[in-house]
């Protein structure tokens, strides 16, 4: 089968023929129709995170396709089902985190396109218990980003504790942020969208933001406090330190900052203000299988629709170059050619 392979960190991916995965008990083989491209894939290719991925590696954790083979012991999935293979490839199912509904914190988890091969290939295998069933009315290209960007931002909004009618600020209206905005509106929240371009501000308003702020033209912290008295929750999906600091300062007393983006920086938090104002700071990463079902349900009901651009598998290195330069609006999805 054809795949895009990382053979060496910080080098171009190689498009090559590799052996089709062989199934073990409990696994399914998926013929990939589409696979979203995430910044995590770029980090995997660069090997620049503290925990390195395996080498050689086939990246991709937003793979969507049709099940073409099932192994012994598979009961919940059948040949012909359309499924997604997400970041949470598998977990142990036995630790305190798995047993308390926090399987994304499992220390023994495997991650698609990182610790195991992922969806930048014509075929990918995965444990049947951890693939996501894709609703019949969803297009594989459009639904691919829900497997990471979608469930990640949906989960962040859940853990923020913000309730319908309350205010949430979303810092960064890019690949994650434009999806987070749609989930927030679908959940009944009032949204302040913050970015640093008029183009992103217009996009935010088009997607339903109640207030859109260009952080290069006005101080978003002052604007938020002046207009709504501070937000009940702030979600930072940006990749620069300043946005995280502003997000923290935007939160009202008793509010919550949820950290999602991963800039290479520390987050300075004033202890006195945090204690006095009862502010909570939480980290949130992807979502559980239950979160995934819920995130997909919003998409199936037409409440969330990622902005996508398609590319071919052979164009992955060009896509990564654009990603590094910040030249991508929405999400790029690799569309695999049919036989």
Swiss-Prot record:
Keywords: Metal-binding, NAD, Oxidoreductase, Zinc. Binds 2 Zn(2+) ions per subunit. InterPro entries: ADH-like_C, ADH-like_N, ADH_Zn_CS, GroES-like_sf, NAD(P)-bd_dom_sf, PKS_ER. The keyword Iron-sulfur does not apply. One of its GO terms (molecular function) is alcohol dehydrogenase (NAD+) activity. The keyword Translocase does not apply. It catalyses: a primary alcohol + NAD(+) = an aldehyde + NADH + H(+); a secondary alcohol + NAD(+) = a ketone + NADH + H(+). PROSITE patterns: ADH_ZINC. NAD(+) binds at residues 172-177, 195, 200, 260-262, 331. Its cofactor is Zn(2+). The rate-limiting step is NADH release. Catabolite repression. Belongs to the zinc-containing alcohol dehydrogenase family. Active with primary alcohols, including methanol. NCBIfam families: PRK09422.1. This is Alcohol dehydrogenase. It comes from Geobacillus stearothermophilus. The gene is adh.
């Amino acid at each position: 089968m054809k795949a895009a392979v990382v053979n060496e960190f910080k080098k171009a991916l190689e498009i090559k023929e590799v052996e089709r995965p062989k199934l073990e008990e409990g696994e399914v083989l998926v013929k990939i129709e589409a696979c979203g491209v995430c910044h995590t894939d770029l980090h995997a290719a660069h090997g620049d995170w503290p925990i390195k991925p395996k080498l050689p590696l086939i990246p991709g954790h937003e793979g969507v396709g049709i099940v073409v083979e099932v192994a012994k012991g598979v009961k919940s999935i059948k040949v012909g089902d359309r499924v997604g293979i997400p970041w949470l490839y598998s977990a142990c199912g036995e630790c305190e985190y798995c047993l308390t509904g926090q399987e994304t914190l499992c220390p023994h988890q495997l991650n698609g396109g990182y610790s195991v091969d992922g969806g930048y290939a014509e075929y990918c295998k995965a444990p049947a218990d951890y693939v996501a069933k894709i609703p019949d009315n969803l297009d594989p290209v459009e639904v691919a980003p829900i497997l990471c960007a979608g469930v990640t931002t949906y989960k962040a909004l859940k853990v923020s504790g913000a309730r319908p009618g309350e205010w949430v600020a979303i810092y960064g209206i890019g690949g994650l942020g434009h999806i987070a905005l749609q989930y927030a509106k679908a959940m009944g929240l009032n949204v302040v969208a913050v970015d640093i371009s008029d183009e992103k501000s217009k996009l935010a308003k088009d997607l339903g933001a109640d207030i859109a702020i260009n952080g290069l033209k006005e101080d978003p912290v002052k604007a938020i406090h002046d207009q709504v008295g501070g937000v009940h929750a702030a979600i930072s999906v940006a990749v620069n330190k300043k946005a995280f600091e502003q997000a923290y300062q935007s939160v009202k007393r008793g509010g919550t900052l949820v950290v999602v983006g991963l800039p290479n920086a520390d987050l300075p938090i004033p202890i006195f203000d945090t204690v006095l104002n009862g502010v909570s700071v939480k980290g949130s990463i992807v979502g559980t299988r239950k979160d995934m079902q819920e995130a997909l349900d919003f998409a199936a009901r037409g409440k969330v629709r990622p902005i996508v651009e398609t590319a071919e598998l052979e164009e992955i290195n060009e896509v990564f170059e654009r990603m590094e330069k910040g030249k991508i609006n929405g999400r790029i999805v690799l569309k695999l050619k049919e036989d």
